């Protein structure tokens, strides 16, 4: 909200692409954007309000695999999960469950590097190393 107000103060036209009373969707896809959002819970609730009952949200974001170990070992930014520094959030199964708490969304699938079998790693090596994904379903 602060950023929106700042942009408006600079005479920039700010458009909210998801507004109330707009069409509902069966599927919403977000690729490499959620880690940049300052308030992912509010954004997720906004996306949820734009879903039909039984609709899905698919989110892809950088993997946080191994990041906890990095910050325990005198972490300095380099090109990784949290850098460039505009990556405001990292997600894992636990943080995603926290985000969807008290929403009408159910976590259907969480694919992460540390949950894959070795034989699956060869299917799409780039995405397996760098990106996790979560599939959510609107249930009520």
Region locations from a protein language model:
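Conserved SAM-binding loop
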Residues: 1-73, 85-102, 136-138
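Conserved beta-strand segments of alpha/beta enzyme cores
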Residues: 13, 106-109
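A C-terminal cap/extension of S-adenosyl-L-methionine-dependent methyltransferases
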Residues: 72-76, 108-140
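Glycine-rich FAD cofactor-binding loop and adjacent beta-loop-alpha segment at the N-terminus
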Residues: 80-84
